[in-house]
């Protein structure tokens, strides 16, 4: 047994050494396109990860989401009140419920700087693990071109960069979202419980992924739904006697969460209030995007749920999240990280985002580019502060439009019984079989 383990370890080291040395040896033939792309993308991907997770984070930013978290867990450790903030200020506030405070409590046992760096490291690792799981979900490996391309693309975005620089928990939320989708796709009873546990843990911290509970409900995966409800209830109930004045969360913090603020808010309501849109127009836009979402979800459920579960789960998750950010009261740009599973569907033959309008929308909410025009502030403010809202809106419209025209084409060809995928796609799939 010992000899076998030693042999295996030696073979792994030998394989890694050979692969590293191979890059420096004279070639005996022309490299493949994939080899060239991997050689170009991996250094950029690795350095982007290091730059975002070390250089930018240690330099810091005026926006610091971790500071109120650290204050809260420090107060929790000392038995002091936590939910006593002044919400009239625009500084980041502590909004986690008592259960979230309990989960974050270990960070209060370290000094501020080590605690913050540990938090950043955990979120960086979570994003990288989520990237790996996404690759495996879509049948790619670490040796494929997709691996460095995905990592580079993720760490070049505003959502990942600001999550790490602002020191937010969204990296862990992304990992739990990917695990939730993977385990629902697995379908086994034990995996359904695990999926519910994963999304339930996110709900202990924030309700960001709450709309995704519709997926196990529609797919009759009641175990995941039960676990997703029970976990946050149990953790919060357990935390109540441990937190000083826990009811202040319900009387002070929760009304603030449910309200609408006109700063750092990319929802239709938030931007509508900021730019002074009439109430009727804000209401009309929210109803319009709810109708678009309903149409997209119905087409996805009717024609993809059983025939193409991967496409259904990932695309439906994107539709639900886009709707919630546009229509509900609060949405911030770095929430867009949760769309990575949806954006990965671009590699699927029947993807709804293989078109330039979809990626124009993605640019809007993923780019680090600033569009403020200091000489024309009226237009610059609109471009800068609305680009995320425009991007979310355009991507949701594109998704529904593609699905709707697929439906019309299939109906005209009298082939709705076989689904609504383009006619050319069915022969291609048959050939792959």
Curated annotation (Swiss-Prot):
It is a multi-pass membrane protein. It comes from the Bacteria. One of its GO terms (cellular component) is plasma membrane. InterPro entries: GT87. It is an enzyme of class 2 (transferase). Pfam families: GT87 (PF09594). One of its GO terms (biological process) is cell wall organization. Disruption phenotype: Cells lacking this gene result in an increased permeability and an altered cell wall. GO terms for molecular function: hexosyltransferase activity. Its EC number is 2.4.2.47. Coiled coil: none annotated. It is found in: Cell membrane. Pathway: Cell wall biogenesis; cell wall polysaccharide biosynthesis. Keywords: Cell membrane, Cell wall biogenesis/degradation, Glycosyltransferase, Membrane, Transferase, Transmembrane, Transmembrane helix. The keyword Cell wall biogenesis/degradation applies. The chain crosses the membrane at residues 118-138, 140-160, 164-184, 197-217, 224-244, 280-300, 310-330, 333-353, 356-376, 385-405. It catalyses: Adds an alpha-D-arabinofuranosyl group from trans,octacis-decaprenylphospho-beta-D-arabinofuranose at the 3-O-position of an alpha-(1->5)-arabinofuranan chain attached to a beta-(1->5)-galactofuranan chain. Involved in the biosynthesis of the arabinogalactan (AG) region of the mycolylarabinogalactan-peptidoglycan (mAGP) complex, an essential component of the mycobacterial cell wall. It can also use (Z,Z)-farnesylphosphoryl D-arabinose (Z-FPA), and to a lesser extent (E,E,Z,Z,Z,Z)-heptaprenylphosphoryl D-arabinose (Z-HPA) and (Z)-nerylphosphoryl D-arabinose (Z-NPA) as sugar donors. Belongs to the glycosyltransferase 87 family. This is Alpha-(1->3)-arabinofuranosyltransferase. The lineage of its organism: Bacteria, Bacillati, Actinomycetota, Actinomycetes, Mycobacteriales.
């Amino acid at each position: 047994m010992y000899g076998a383990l030693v042999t295996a370890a030696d073979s792994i080291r030998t394989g890694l050494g050979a692969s590293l040395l191979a890059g420096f040896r004279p070639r005996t033939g022309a490299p493949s396109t994939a080899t060239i792309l991997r050689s170009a993308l991996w250094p950029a991907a690795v350095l982007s990860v290091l730059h975002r997770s070390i250089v930018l984070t240690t330099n810091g930013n005026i926006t610091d989401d971790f500071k109120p978290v650290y204050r809260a867990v420090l107060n929790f450790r000392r038995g002091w009140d936590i939910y006593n903030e002044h919400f009239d200020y625009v500084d980041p506030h502590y909004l986690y419920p008592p259960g979230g405070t309990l989960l974050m409590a270990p960070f209060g046992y370290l000094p501020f700087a080590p605690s913050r760096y540990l938090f950043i490291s955990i979120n960086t690792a979570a994003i990288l693990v989520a990237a790996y799981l996404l690759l495996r979900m879509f049948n790619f490996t670490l040796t494929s071109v997709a691996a460095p391309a995905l990592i580079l693309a993720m760490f070049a975005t505003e959502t990942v960069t600001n999550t790490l620089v602002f020191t937010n928990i969204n990296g862990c939320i992304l990992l739990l979202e990917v695990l939730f989708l993977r385990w629902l796709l697995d379908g086994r009873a034990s995996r359904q419980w695990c999926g519910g546990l994963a999304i339930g843990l996110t709900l202990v911290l924030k309700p960001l992924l709450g709309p995704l509970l519709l997926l196990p409900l529609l797919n009759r995966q009641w175990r995941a739904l039960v676990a997703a409800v029970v976990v946050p209830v149990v953790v919060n109930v357990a935390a109540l006697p441990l937190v000083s004045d826990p009811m202040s969360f319900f009387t002070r913090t929760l009304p603030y969460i449910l309200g609408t603020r006109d700063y750092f808010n990319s929802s239709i309501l938030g931007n509508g209030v900021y730019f002074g849109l009439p109430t009727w127009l804000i209401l009309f836009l929210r109803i319009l995007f709810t109708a678009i979402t309903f149409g997209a979800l119905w087409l996805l459920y009717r024609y993809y749920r059983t025939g193409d579960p991967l496409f259904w789960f990932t695309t439906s998750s994107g539709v639900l999240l886009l709707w919630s950010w546009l229509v509900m009261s609060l949405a911030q740009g770095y929430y867009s990280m949760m769309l990575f599973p949806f954006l990965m569907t671009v590699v699927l033959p029947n993807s709804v985002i293989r078109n330039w309008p979809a990626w124009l929308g993605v640019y809007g909410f993923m780019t680090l580019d600033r569009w403020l025009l200091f000489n024309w502030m009226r237009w610059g403010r609109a471009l800068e502060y609305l680009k995320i809202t425009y991007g979310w809106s355009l991507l949701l419209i594109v998704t529904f439009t593609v699905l709707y025209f697929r439906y019309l084409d299939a109906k005209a060809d009298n082939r709705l019984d076989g689904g609504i995928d383009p006619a050319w796609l069915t022969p291609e799939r048959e050939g792959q079989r």
